C-alpha cells in the first residue's frame, strides 16, 4: 500500500522518539484505509452535516468593506457546532481513534476551541478525554475551560515554560509517549510529526471546497484572494487546499504581529523565524541566536505558537501563498468593527485575517472579491477584549487628566 509523503518540500518529517514511530505508522495506515472506506466516509460526512451543521454559510458583508469596489465574503466556521472550524477535523480524528481501538483521547489546546471540540467529540463517541492547556490560557479562556469540564473532559493546566500552547503541546506529546497503546493524541493543528499535517488538512479541506462551490454560485467566478489567520495553520490550510491549483486565486495567511514584528512580542515564525526542529517536524521556528525557542506572543491564545505547519512553510517558500501579519491593535479594532458593522462577533484569531482583508479592500482599484475564513466566534474573547478596552479607556482618562493639570 502506498504511504503518504512525510515532507512538503524540505519541511515536515517525523522527528520523534523511536518509541512513537509505531503509533505514527499505525495512524498513517488507519488514515489511508479510512480514506478509502465508504462506511467511514459516510459516517464522517453524516456527523459533519447532522451534528456539526455543515455546510456553513458564505456571508457577503454589507457594511464592512471600506471600498465599493471590494466585496468581502465570510466563510462562517463560527456557525459550526462548537463555535469554530476545530470541530471538523476533531470528528474525523475521533472516528479514526475508534477505528484503531483506542479508548482515550489526549489533546492540547490554546484558545480552548480545540479542547471544546475534542470534548464534544469524545462525549458523542464515548471516549475518555484529557486536555492539556497552558496555565495562562486556562486563565484567559475560562468559559471554554468550563465547557470542556461540563462535557466530561479532564483539563490539565501546564505551568512549565511560557505556560501557553507550545508547552501544552510538549506535555501532551510526553503523555502520548507513555500511553499510545490505549490513547490517541488528537493534535489540534496542521503541524507536528507526519502524518498529522496531512490528516488535519484532509479533515479540514471541506472549508475551501464548500467556499469554491458557494462563491461560484454567488458570483460566477473564483475569488481574487482567500484569507485566513495562521497559528499552527489548520483553518488556513483547510481554506487553501482546494484553491492551491487555482493559480489566479491569491492565498493569504495572516500571522499575529502582536506588539509589532520589530519587537520580541509577536508570533510570526514565517515572517521572523529560522528553520528548526520542533514538535516532531522541521519548520520555521522562532528561535534566538543560540537556537533556543523564543516565547511567542499574541492577544489571541489560539495564534500564540512559535512555529507553523510544514505545508504553510512550503507554500511560502515556493511563493504560492503569501504570509502577512496583523498586530494586536489591528485585530482588536477589527473585532469591534465587525461586531458594529455586521452584528457578528469574531474570534480574536479570525480578527487578524479580517484586519488584513479590510486593508486589502481599502487599496482595491478594480472590482475585487475577497473571502475571509471566519474561523471561530468571539464569545470566548469578550472578557479579554472588555478588560483591554477598559484599561485603554482608563489610561486615556489618566493621560487627559495629567494634560489638564
From Swiss-Prot:
Q: Does the keyword Lyase apply?
A: yes
The GO molecular function terms of this record are: tryptophan synthase activity
According to UniProt, the reaction catalysed is: (1S,2R)-1-C-(indol-3-yl)glycerol 3-phosphate + L-serine = D-glyceraldehyde 3-phosphate + L-tryptophan + H2O
Query: According to the UniProt entry, what is the EC number of this protein?
Result: 4.2.1.20
Instruction: Provide a GO CC annotation, any one.
Output: cytoplasm
Cofactor(s) required for function per UniProt: pyridoxal 5'-phosphate
Pathway-wise, it operates in: Amino-acid biosynthesis; L-tryptophan biosynthesis; L-tryptophan from chorismate: step 5/5
InterPro entries reported for this sequence = Trp_synth_b_CS, Trp_synth_beta, Trp_synth_beta/beta-like, TrpB-like_PALP, TrpB-like_PALP_sf
Q: Which residues form the signal peptide?
A: none
Q: Which UniProt keywords apply?
A: Amino-acid biosynthesis, Aromatic amino acid biosynthesis, Lyase, Pyridoxal phosphate, Tryptophan biosynthesis
Q: Does the keyword Membrane apply?
A: no
> Which PROSITE patterns does its entry note?
TRP_SYNTHASE_BETA
Residue numbers carrying N6-(pyridoxal phosphate)lysine: 86
Q: Which domain of life is it from?
A: Bacteria
Free-text function comment from the UniProt entry: The beta subunit is responsible for the synthesis of L-tryptophan from indole and L-serine.
Protein family per UniProt:
Belongs to the TrpB family.
The record's note on quaternary structure and interaction partners says: Tetramer of two alpha and two beta chains.
HAMAP family, per this entry? Trp_synth_beta
The protein here is known as Tryptophan synthase beta chain
Q: Which gene encodes it?
A: trpB
Amino acid at each position: 500500500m502506498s504511504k503518504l509523503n512525510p515532507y512538503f518540500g524540505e519541511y515536515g518529517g517525523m522527528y520523534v522518539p523511536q518509541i512513537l514511530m509505531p503509533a505514527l505508522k499505525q495512524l498513517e495506515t488507519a488514515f489511508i484505509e479510512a480514506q478509502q472506506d465508504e462506511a467511514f466516509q459516510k459516517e464522517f460526512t453524516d456527523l459533519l452535516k447532522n451534528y456539526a451543521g455543515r455546510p456553513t454559510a458564505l456571508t457577503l458583508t454589507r457594511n464592512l468593506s471600506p471600498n465599493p469596489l471590494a466585496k468581502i465574503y465570510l466563510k462562517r466556521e463560527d456557525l459550526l457546532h462548537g463555535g469554530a472550524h476545530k470541530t471538523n477535523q476533531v470528528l474525523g480524528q475521533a472516528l479514526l481513534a475508534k477505528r484503531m481501538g483506542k479508548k482515550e483521547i489526549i489533546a492540547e489546546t490554546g484558545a480552548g476551541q480545540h479542547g471544546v471540540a475534542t470534548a464534544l467529540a469524545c462525549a458523542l463517541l464515548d471516549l475518555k478525554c484529557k486536555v492539556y492547556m497552558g496555565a495562562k490560557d486556562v486563565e484567559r479562556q475560562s468559559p471554554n475551560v468550563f465547557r470542556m469540564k461540563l462535557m466530561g473532559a479532564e483539563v490539565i493546566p501546564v505551568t512549565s515554560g511560557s505556560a501557553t500552547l507550545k508547552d501544552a503541546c510538549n506535555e501532551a506529546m510526553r503523555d502520548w509517549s507513555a500511553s499510545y497503546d490505549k490513547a490517541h493524541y488528537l493534535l489540534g493543528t496542521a503541524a507536528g510529526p507526519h502524518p498529522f499535517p496531512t490528516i488535519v488538512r484532509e479533515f479540514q479541506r471541506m472549508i475551501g471546497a464548500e467556499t469554491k462551490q458557494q462563491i461560484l454560485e454567488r458570483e460566477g467566478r473564483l475569488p481574487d484572494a482567500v484569507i485566513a489567520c495562521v497559528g499552527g495553520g489548520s483553518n488556513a490550510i483547510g481554506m487553501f487546499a482546494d484553491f492551491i491549483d487555482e493559480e489566479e486565486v491569491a492565498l493569504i495567511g495572516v500571522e499575529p504581529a502582536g506588539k509589532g514584528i520589530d519587537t520580541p512580542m509577536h508570533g510570526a515564525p514565517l515572517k521572523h523565524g529560522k528553520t528548526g526542529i520542533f514538535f516532531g517536524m522541521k519548520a520555521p521556528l522562532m528561535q534566538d541566536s543560540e537556537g533556543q525557542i523564543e516565547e511567542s506572543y499574541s492577544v489571541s491564545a489560539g495564534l500564540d505558537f512559535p512555529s507553523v505547519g510544514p505545508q504553510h512553510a512550503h507554500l511560502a517558500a515556493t511563493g504560492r501563498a503569501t504570509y502577512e501579519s496583523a498586530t494586536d491593535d489591528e485585530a482588536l479594532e477589527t473585532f469591534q468593527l465587525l461586531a458594529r458593522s455586521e452584528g457578528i462577533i469574531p474570534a480574536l484569531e479570525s480578527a487578524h485575517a479580517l484586519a488584513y482583508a479590510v486593508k486589502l479592500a481599502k487599496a482595491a482599484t478594480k472590482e475585487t472579491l475577497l473571502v475571509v475564513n471566519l474561523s471561530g466566534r468571539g464569545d470566548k474573547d469578550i472578557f479579554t477584549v472588555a478588560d483591554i478596552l477598559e484599561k485603554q479607556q482608563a489610561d486615556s482618562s489618566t493621560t487627559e487628566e495629567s494634560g489638564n493639570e
